[in-house]
Amino acid sequence: MREQRITSGLGQIAVAIDENGAQIPVVFLHGVFLDRSLWADYGSDLTGRTHIYIDMPAHGNSSDIGHDWSLDDCVEMLINVLDELGVQECIVIGHSWGSMTALRAATKFPTRFKAVGLFNMPFKRTSGLSRLGFILQKLMVIFPRFYAKQAAKSLYSKAVLRQRPDLSTKMQDRLSKRPSKEISRVIDAVILDPTDATQLLHTLRVPAFAMIGETDYVGNPPKIETATVPGGHISPHEAVQETRAAIKRVVELASAKSA
């Protein structure tokens, strides 16, 4: 695995590259409060292609950001990383925040993407009591371990946390390393600020496949082939075999487009 850091408008972005052949690579983007280890069970042997794993801004080995930002900035970050790596076309697999970024990037730059995997993707604007709950939760980020423990309970199913309590512990460890202001900015940019993306799904011209968990809080995205799998919002941890099949399906869509 080759690792490097790429300068972007959202700080230094850590990238790990699992090289495997000369076909169009697969790029992986994780969700909030996770890192590229989300994809540990999905090496390049799965697709026979090079896999590029990105630590999202202010997550994993990527640096803090230091200023307010938006999902549009994430799109620019992704395109910047691809440009720096010399990747003109790719397949992108996104989880949650990563899929929100992938959708917007594929809509804005459709020629750069052969297919997109939209896994556990929130696409409706956070509103009502849910929005109020996230606003109140922001007050807890000054206690990152406590906040992360509560976040894990809402993101993972109860069953998987009983089987793998380490998932909650690792989330607590990750958030405890970040300034509370950075965590607060993530909540704003990814959860509170995004507008409804339904129209983007209707106008998407890139082949796409979606996956959601049975107890996931996100709905079924319109006009997109969707698989419902066991578990909650973090399907790559909770439904490994189903996620592997979903990744292969996205690659199939890309191959069909190229044929």
Where are these regions (language model features)?
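Short beta-strand/loop motif that positions the catalytic acidic residue
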Residues: 204, 210-212
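Active-site loop/oxyanion-hole signature of alpha/beta-hydrolase fold enzymes
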Residues: 40, 52-93
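Conserved HGGG/HGGXW glycine-rich cap/lid loop of the alpha/beta-hydrolase fold
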Residues: 11-63
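Gly/Ala-rich beta-loop-alpha elbow adjacent to hydrolase catalytic centers
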Residues: 94-98, 102
